[in-house]
A protein has these predicted regions:
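Preference for long, amphipathic alpha-helical scaffolds in soluble/luminal domains
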Residues: 1-610
Length: 610
């Protein structure tokens, strides 16, 4: 070992110790971790819209939420979908309307700037369908021009190309709620207009939209009534224990609206439970009041547990034991929508959220398997999880997030599907995490694993990287793929060497790695961006798994050492999580800590072992 490398390792060890101390301090007494999950101001504005419709919006809530929304405005008056991102029309319109609803006057300087931005971005008519649905709820747009979602869709065979089960679970839940809403067309008018945002030129409506509107005007009445009731029952049946629908904001708020418009009173147990649960997603501090679009306690906890184990914390440490036991208790033991395509498969998955029994996810389950095996807790639960993972392999040999073979191209062509990704095809990053778990299980020679490896290798980009569906972006995908290949005995595969060469070529001058979320729409941004702690850690994890602990890795480690904050963490305002590529992004506030701990832990302990 060179003197320089020895110095770097010693500095990494000190940095790691501080980070571990910080991570342990953030653990909840029952053993779990939960970091803030930051998104964009549409979630906060829509909370105001929901509460206005339900008659529950009070001045304090409106004022505190408006404070947060104003703090996110860009200098040019617009709002973005992620920190440092470009202006986004629909986000800016929803923020503008939310601020008006909170009492901000149209002649206020910040709203004048927002209006200018909206005009430059295309005006009110160019907003997404989802935004126009919210405006229709407030009486600021007409439901008659919004694409309807016929509840009769519920009667399509489950395996039909456009059945609700051909949509990803997040879209499926939202669409069923919107079947009710677009049929009943709820409106609670606000006391202002937004005519100043309109240009007066609407885009032509596609043929399918016109057909759906034609049927909506003249439906088969008895069938429509039965279908509406079927949609209502489907929604009610899928409410989770915490009051949510899928643990995520879009189906949650639209389910509340749909059920209220259908006639359920606010004190109905379903609505009361849903509203009470929504309050637990509220954060308020000196920056204002904001809503989490989702909460990620299982994901945060399993990543934190793996990080501690990577850092050398012993499995009998109380923090490790508490975390593992908490995870075991989150096992999903019932069949959810995934059983539509796997009716004979026994349950065994784990959710992302506190409560999501209907939709356990494959990514979390793979990570939980690795964490439980290493912690020596929950062996039976891990066995069931492995069986469930093997059973959830898609026909293209990869793994998706929630479903099997949910990859039809038809749903995204529908006129109301412009609010983000609506299907759940297998992705390289989820496939990689499953393969890493199965490789650690000693199953590298299983036929299912070999097929999965072939799938992962086939998805490598020409430059040596992998696309990241659930994290930003090619750095994330590559950071997942290389450890998976190594875990399955392919560390010396040419694909791994190409990945190392690619990572070497995209390292920033400061030693870190960064990738702007614009890379999802513009290839020029691939692996380009300000260095972040989480993305640098992903690169280190890949390089270390590949056996490449030379100058590139050393510089990346030095970046983490040099940028650590006094509290043992790292500053990271940049979003490195992905909800819908190109449309919706996430800033997991624990990513900036758990991934550096894992990366530094593997480097430091690798040196010790060597």
């Amino acid at each position: 070992m060179t003197a320089t490398k020895h110095t770097t390792i010693e500095a990494a060890r000190e940095t790691l110790d501080r980070a571990v101390e910080r991570l342990l301090a953030l653990q909840h007494p029952d053993g779990h971790w939960k970091g803030e999950l930051e998104t964009n101001v549409t979630i906060d504005a829509e909370d105001l819209f929901l509460r206005h419709y339900l008659g529950l919006l009070d001045e304090r809530t409106a004022t505190a939420t408006a404070t947060w929304i104003r703090s996110r405005q860009r200098d040019d008056g617009s709002f973005a979908t992620f920190f440092g991102g470009p202006p986004d029309l629909s986000t800016t319109v929803e923020a503008y309307v939310g601020l008006r609803l909170a009492g901000d006057q149209p002649d206020a300087e910040h709203l004048q700037r927002a209006r200018t931005a909206i005009d430059q971005l295309g005006g009110l008519e160019a907003t997404r369908v989802f935004t126009r649905m919210w405006l229709s709820l407030l009486g600021l747009w007409s439901w008659s021009t919004v694409p309807p979602l016929p509840p009769e869709q519920m009667y399509l065979p489950k395996r039909a190309p456009l059945s609700i089960y051909s949509f990803g679970c997040w879209a499926r839940q939202t669409i069923v709620a919107l079947q009710i809403a677009t049929t009943l067309r709820p409106v609670r008018p606000v006391d202002f207009t937004i005519d100043e945002l309109a240009r007066g030129t609407a885009a032509p409506r596609p043929l399918l939209d016109r057909i759906l509107h034609g049927y909506a005007r003249h439906p088969l009445r008895p069938l429509r009534r039965r279908a509406l009731r079927t949609s209502v029952n489907w929604v009610i049946d899928r409410q989770e224990a915490d009051g949510s629908w899928g643990g995520i904001q879009p189906p949650w708020v639209w389910s509340l609206i749909a059920l209220r418009e259908y006639g359920l009173p606010l004190d109905h147990p379903v609505l009361a439970k849903g509203l009470a649960g929504l309050d637990t997603f509220t954060l308020e501090d000196e920056l204002g009041r904001r809503i989490e679009a989702c909460q990620s306690p299982v994901w945060d906890t399993v990543l934190a547990l793996i990080a501690l184990l990577d850092a050398g914390v012993e499995r009998d440490h109380p923090a490790v034991a508490r975390a593992a036991e908490w995870l075991v208790a989150r096992e999903v033991t019932i069949r959810g929508d995934w059983a539509v395509r796997r009716p004979k498969l026994a349950p065994g998955g784990f959710p992302f959220e506190y409560a999501n029994d209907n939709y356990p996810d494959i990514d979390d389950t793979a990570e939980v398997v690795m964490a439980l095996r290493r912690s020596g807790v929950g062996e039976d639960a891990a066995d069931r999880a492995v069986a469930w993972l093997l059973g959830m392999q898609s026909s293209n040999d990869g793994w998706a997030a929630f479903d099997v073979d949910n990859d039809s191209s038809l749903p995204r062509r529908l006129p109301f599907c412009d609010f983000g990704e609506v299907t759940d095809p297998p992705s390289a990053d989820v496939t990689a995490h499953v393969l890493e778990a199965l490789g650690q299980e000693g199953r590298a020679d299983d036929p299912a694993v070999r097929r999965g490896l072939d799938r992962l290798l086939a998805e490598q980009e020409a430059d040596g990287s992998w696309f990241g569906r659930w994290g930003a972006n090619y750095v994330y995908g590559t950071g997942a793929a290389v450890p998976a290949l190594a875990a399955c005995g392919l560390r010396d595969h040419p694909a791994v060497r190409r990945a190392v060469a690619w990572l070497t070529s995209v390292q920033n001058e400061d030693g870190g790695f960064g990738e702007d979320l614009r890379s999802y729409r513009d290839p020029a941004w691939r692996a380009r961006g300000t260095s972040t702690a989480s993305q640098t850690a992903w690169a280190i994890l890949a390089l270390h798994a590949a056996g490449s602990d030379g100058a590139v890795t050393e510089a990346a480690v030095r970046f983490l050492v040099d940028t650590q904050t006094p509290d043992g963490g790292w500053d990271e305002p940049f979003f490195t999580g992905t909800g819908f590529p190109g449309d919706f992004y996430l800033n997991y506030h624990l990513y900036r800590l758990v991934f550096p701990v894992s990366a530094l832990g593997r480097i430091v302990n690798g040196e010790r072992a060597g």
